[in-house]
Amino acid sequence: MSTGGHVVAVTCLALEARIALGPGVSVICNHASKLVASLEAAVKQGASGIISFGIAGGLAPHLAAGDWVVGSRVRTEQGHFPTDYRWARTLVDALPGAVH
């Protein structure tokens, strides 16, 4: 994705949405049935990136609350889709201690 525009944070919980929302960040919260349409609209409106944002801590035993996890792919019922490598590297380099 390009470097201009805003980032869209996709969340499940209202608490996560409140944490993620800020300057340059819009939020799509708990819209599973409308997620694709909402993301397509955000891209048409100039979104430069999409992140999945959550506060769950049970991903792996070696992770603690507050750890940054940068994914390399997205898994859906339709298969696995790679994330943007350059953007992932930029995030890993910018976030202290990020796990990729």
List each model region and its residues.
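Glycine-rich phosphate- or other oxyanion-binding loops that anchor nucleotides, phosphorylated ligands
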Residues: S2-H100
